[in-house]
Amino acid sequence: MLRAIGLVYIVIFAGIIVEGQALVGPAGISPLGIYLAEVKKLLPGTIEAFFGAPSLFWLGQGAGLIAGVAWSGLAAACALVLNVWPRLALAVCWTVLLSFVSTWNKFSPAQLDGLMLEAALLCLPFAPPGIRPGLGVMSPPGPFVVFTLRWLLLRVMFESALVKLVSADPHWRNLTAMDVLYETSPSPTVLGYWAHQLPHAAHVLAIVFTFVAEFVAPLAAVFGGRRGRWFAFLVWSALQIGIQLTCNFGWLNTAALGLGFLLLDDRMLASAADKLGLRAASRFLARHATAPALPPTPPTNAASAASTRGANGAALVWQRCGRYGLRAALAVHFGLTLFHFARVCRLPVEDLPPVITRPEKFFAEFRSANGYSLYANFEPAHVQVDFEGSNDGGKTWRTYPYRHVPQQVDRRPPFTAPWFARFETTIEIESSKPPKSSVIPLVAAHLLARNPDVMARFASDPFPDRPPTVVRMRRHRLAFTDPATLRRTGHYWHKEFDDDFLPALHVTPQGDIAQFDLTAAETALHAGSFRTAFALFERDYQLGNLDAGYHLADMHTRGLGGPVQPEKAFALFADLAARGEIRALHNVGLSYEHGLGVAADLTKAAESYRRAAAQGRMLSLYALGVLAATDRLVPKNDIEGLAFLLRAGAMATGTDGAAAFVREEQPAHVKRLAERMSAADVAAARALALTPR
């Protein structure tokens, strides 16, 4: 088990060595020095500040120290795997990981890092003492030490089951969790893609198996004797292997699998080896399952005996103090874990007297007594921000390619676990969390500044010729395609544009990095100062702000500050559409449909609407459905038209005017189409509406 912990720590520190400078280095996204300065402002006292962020980096925040600390952690992890001074190695692993985890804020998922911190701390007294202790037969861990580690495993299992039942997320209770788990996990594998395609009944069986592994297995381990522990070990291991092969949750499942070996003892392993015909292994394990006899004590004279008794007496006192101190520390840790267990059970822990809750708050930032709620909640969709740059004023855009997480729709989902892509996973998590994260625009700023550490987190530099002057942050929704689509197109993912996460960043004429801000232009527009508004919009459009260009086209369309100029509006909309502005692409379709500034052409109208609809534009879906209902869709296809209307209606859930309009008008067009279609065609349209395109 200790070797497994060491292997996981090797993966952790290798990741920190690779990504640490980009994340928290002096020139990184969230520099340690800035973070610790903020902690110092909030907690002026030295001791208070340390307990607010327990870290070696109070000694310094330079790139050399960050690298040195990370490499020392890797060396300690290697020593643990090689069984060299395991207690010291565990202490170094815990100290180094805590130093990073307590200072890099959003780059530390609580479940992953917290589990490894708690495991390392509890393994300290479990590991045998000495530089080369072998299997530690001469100094086996005490019963309370073994109990605390098994208590950790049982909490990981049982709390994860319990939180699924009491969580506000209904997916586990209504047996639909596995219908969404694979698709919404940060980086599913190709096996996750195929698991997603299984029928709902298979997903229900997977849910039942999950609860057996997390709820029944710990009870069997506690009350079922050795057979119960074998059962718990096997189903728990199968669950962790299955999740790791389908979902890529970093080292989480590897660590949970390693902890599962705590359910076994040498006698159980010896018996299993014997039944499997592994005689040598069986004899070896049986030998070490029994404590060796102590060597005989040589005869001594009275003087030396008295001296020995004195020395032994002092040693016994120290041993007792150490033993009682360890028991007290483990008892405190056990008490702290009860707070987290109570929270999972939704008990009112915060209502307890401060004298009881104070220790838990005091040690909270050490993150070594935790609650575990694995896979309790699900995001409504797989959402991700892509960084796109332009070096020609927004005429063309190039995407910064990620290394691991889904982005290219035709890329086979890879196997990356136990490696944890901390940078990419953080971007994905922050893409959908309210309020909008400050991490994402900081990454965009570093890309404009050509920070080599941050740029190295991407698979390649899309601007080897000339650096970008604008970087935008475009949010997309991703959904798995079905096998038929995969065979036809080679696409594993369907990707829809959602919105711009924040206004784009650009390099000003003075060489500074700034965020596009249309406040002044919009204020002038609302005040009726159309000439001023036009000039401000035009300036930002020339810098690459497509939103400013859309305002310009809208002013031409409505005749604000001059006559209505549909030709100029269409030219602007067409230019914006070519640059990837989805609203403008819809308006190009509108112009072709109604002959606004261009000759009417229903074929080109449908083409533009389809391109916008493929990127998730609700109004374009609705427009295509209306064309079908009014017999103007080219080519004619009532099944597709009804599917467009149904998809538009499903998307019209917001409070904005466009959503309200679709909700009001869509039913009449649906009725009109459905009345002239056969029942089979209507069923086909409904199925098509539910299929990612």
Please name every model-derived segment.
Residues 1-517:
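Alpha-helical membrane-anchoring segments
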Residues 525-529, 542-546, 558-560, 578-581, ...:
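Short helix-capping/linker turns of helical repeat alpha-solenoids
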Residues 525-531, 565-566, 601-602:
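Helix-turn-helix repeat elements of alpha-solenoid scaffolds
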Residues 636-656, 687-690:
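TPR/TPR-like (Sel1-like) alpha-helical repeat modules
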